[in-house]
Amino acid sequence: MAAAVAMETDDAGNRLRFQLELEFVQCLANPNYLNFLAQRGYFKDKAFVNYLKYLLYWKEPEYAKYLKYPQCLHMLELLQYEHFRKELVNAQCAKFIDEQQILHWQHYSRKRVRLQQALAEQQQQNNTAGK
């Protein structure tokens, strides 16, 4: 009986840890949040830097599939470099990253729409050729 209760407690604890780490990793996609962390000295704390290294497991497909903001993995990778962490103290650096993300999303959206249109046209041609 006690073993079953302990197992349920472990499962609940693991689920909570998963949710908290998922939320935190996704916050790393926000350059303004990274600037906030840098200005408050989090990136100078060796334990915090080690935690960022630990979080690299989110790059594995079995975990990455839960991410809504995959660019957070790129930021997590960049945060492994001390030079990048130091640059984030500068608000202009965060602003630049933010602008680059917006440009990427705009370009990606347009490119994706064109690709979907081309695939739909190709499928329509294949359907009419098959009749």
From Swiss-Prot:
The modification N-acetylalanine is found at A2. GO terms for cellular component: core mediator complex; mediator complex; nucleoplasm; nucleus; ubiquitin ligase complex. Pfam families: Med31. It is found in: Nucleus. Keywords: Acetylation, Activator, Nucleus, Transcription, Transcription regulation. GO terms for biological process: limb development; negative regulation of fibroblast proliferation; positive regulation of transcription elongation by RNA polymerase II; positive regulation of transcription initiation by RNA polymerase II; protein ubiquitination; RNA polymerase II preinitiation complex assembly. Its main location: nucleus. InterPro entries: Med31_sf, Mediator_Med31. Gene3D superfamilies: Mediator of RNA polymerase II, submodule Med31 (Soh1). GO terms for molecular function: transcription coregulator activity; ubiquitin protein ligase activity. Belongs to the Mediator complex subunit 31 family. Component of the Mediator complex, a coactivator involved in the regulated transcription of nearly all RNA polymerase II-dependent genes. Mediator functions as a bridge to convey information from gene-specific regulatory proteins to the basal RNA polymerase II transcription machinery. Mediator is recruited to promoters by direct interactions with regulatory proteins and serves as a scaffold for the assembly of a functional preinitiation complex with RNA polymerase II and the general transcription factors. Component of the Mediator complex, which is composed of MED1, MED4, MED6, MED7, MED8, MED9, MED10, MED11, MED12, MED13, MED13L, MED14, MED15, MED16, MED17, MED18, MED19, MED20, MED21, MED22, MED23, MED24, MED25, MED26, MED27, MED29, MED30, MED31, CCNC, CDK8 and CDC2L6/CDK11. The MED12, MED13, CCNC and CDK8 subunits form a distinct module termed the CDK8 module. Mediator containing the CDK8 module is less active than Mediator lacking this module in supporting transcriptional activation. This is Mediator of RNA polymerase II transcription subunit 31.
